[in-house]
Amino acid sequence: MAMDRPASPRPSGTGSASAHALLRGLLKTLPEAQRDELDGLARLRDIAEGTALVREGERYRTVGYILSGALGMQKTLPDGRLHVIGLLVQHDMFGRLFDGPSGFDLVALAPAHLLEFDRDAFESFVARHPEAQQLLLTRILDEIDTAREWLLLMSGHKVVERVAAFLLILFRRALRQPGQAGDRRVRIALPVRRVDLAHYLGTRPESLSRALHDLQRAGAIHLVDPNTFEVIGLRALVDAAGSDLLLSGAGGEPRVAGPGGG
């Protein structure tokens, strides 16, 4: 099991044009003055793989968004083994508000770059601005969806079903990001190393590789490189997943560009 390693916080304020733009895109429904206030509360933080943001039974001290990397929602089984119950990836929100202790460990499964806020300051902001309460509802629903998605994903009996379901989860989340149109080709990077992804999906690296190439041969995805893919046949990918994951919350089934499309 990875041990916690010191994070390397950056100075107060976003300090990054891309993070600033992301924050404003994610919170575009809020009035300008409120976005400015949140922008002043935000900070960037880099954490190493294995760093725990919170342990089961502890209270979150920060909330925020993942700019890159992946965080795993983990439970420790009675025999000491770790069980992943959910995965948070780029642009997902983490942390709990107006709630008690966490029901799971939240651990970096890869080096992660975070845009975060002090929890107490963020709660105070939400309490003072009713318009921001929609953020709470979205956060609660996202966490419920994440747990449901992972449960459905791991119910797949075949490796290719679990891999297809995981790629669909990444695809659906990518469509929700600011500026992402539903009718354009979406290029998505795997959030963790293949060897780690195989472990989280309950298989071996070679089986994961075979499943990815099977999905490419079936016309569901195009492998840009070993860690990046494009969905080119959404119906084929949904069929391969063999479960009802899908595109609720993404505005229906989008048109996806074929191999020669733009």
Task: Report each predicted region and the residues it spans.
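Residues that recognize and position ribonucleotide moieties
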Residues: 45, 64, 86, 107, ...
